[in-house]
């Protein structure tokens, strides 16, 4: 059971660090994805747009006039990246604040292609998964051993960033819990005070009523 849990955790880590998928959108539609990213972490987004061809009843490489507008916002809702790219490309950005980063994509629709159906292939890579080590080895002339050491160092650095991010999330959750508990406590005290005041007022009112009726 423990081995199965560890395997599941490793699979989830891999899926979190590298995500490959495709989705269908119309040219007027906007699709957004949320990626939790530690601070100072590189994120690479590879995408390819295909256009639906009714004659072949399939998706073909998109026309030159179709591109993708990509917008990235950090956890503070600040725009990290916003520009128009071609129908196929590679986007890279580095996070400067930890938390959820929203990646939104929509086509630069034109009157000619408006309403067409698109299929977008998307691959999001985070951390050391975003590094092309073959290119690094060729550029820096690293041996196989040096490259392996470089990979291990990058993995350790990424694990440290992930741990720091988890501590940040725990601290934020604890702060939220403490704030919520404090509000619940004050609300309970306020309710108690209101009930006591209402009870006191009802007793005074009943006493005045009985005295007016000369029952006491």
Swiss-Prot record:
Domain called GOLD: residue spans: 30-126
UniProt-annotated location(s): Endoplasmic reticulum membrane
Topology in the lipid bilayer: Single-pass type I membrane protein
Coiled coil: 134-164
Example of a GO biological process term: dorsal/ventral pattern formation
Residue numbers on the Cytoplasmic membrane side: 204-216
Pfam families assigned to the protein according to its UniProt record, in alphabetical order: EMP24_GP25L (PF01105)
Source organism: Drosophila sechellia (Fruit fly)
Oxidoreductase found in the keyword field: no
GO cellular component: endoplasmic reticulum membrane
Protein name (Swiss-Prot/TrEMBL): Transmembrane emp24 domain-containing protein eca
PROSITE patterns referenced in this protein's UniProt entry, alphabetically: GOLD
S-S bonds: none
Chief place of localization: endoplasmic reticulum
Topological domains, Lumenal: 21-182
Family stated for the protein in its record: Belongs to the EMP24/GP25L family.
Keyword Coiled coil on entry: yes
Parts of the chain that traverse the membrane: 183-203
Motif (Prevents secretion from ER): 213-216
Biological function: Eca and bai are essential, though not redundant, for dorsoventral patterning of the embryo. Specifically required during early embryogenesis for the activity of maternal tkv, while the zygotic tkv is not affected. Involved in Golgi organization.
Keywords: Coiled coil, Developmental protein, Endoplasmic reticulum, Membrane, Signal, Transmembrane, Transmembrane helix
């Amino acid at each position: 059971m423990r081995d199965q849990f560890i395997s599941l955790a490793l699979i989830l880590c891999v899926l979190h660090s590298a995500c490959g998928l495709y989705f269908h959108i119309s040219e007027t539609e906007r699709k957004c994805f949320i990626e939790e990213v530690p601070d100072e972490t590189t994120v690479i987004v590879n995408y390819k747009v295909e256009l639906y061809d009714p004659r072949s009843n399939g998706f073909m490489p998109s026309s030159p006039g179709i591109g993708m507008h990509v917008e990235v916002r950090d956890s503070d809702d600040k725009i990290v990246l916003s520009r128009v790219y071609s129908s196929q490309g590679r986007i890279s950005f580095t996070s400067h604040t930890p938390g959820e980063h929203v990646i939104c994509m929509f086509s630069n629709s034109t009157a000619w292609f408006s309403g067409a159906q698109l299929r977008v292939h998307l691959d999001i890579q985070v951390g050391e998964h975003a590094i092309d080590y073959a290119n690094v080895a060729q550029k820096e002339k690293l041996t196989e051993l040096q490259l392996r050491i470089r990979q291990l160092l990058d993995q350790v650095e990424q694990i440290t960033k992930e741990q720091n991010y988890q501590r940040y999330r725990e601290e934020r959750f604890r702060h939220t819990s403490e704030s919520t508990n404090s509000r619940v406590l004050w609300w309970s005290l306020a309710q108690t005070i209101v009930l006591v005041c209402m009870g006191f007022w009802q007793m005074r009112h009943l006493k005045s009523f009985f005295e007016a009726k000369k029952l006491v």
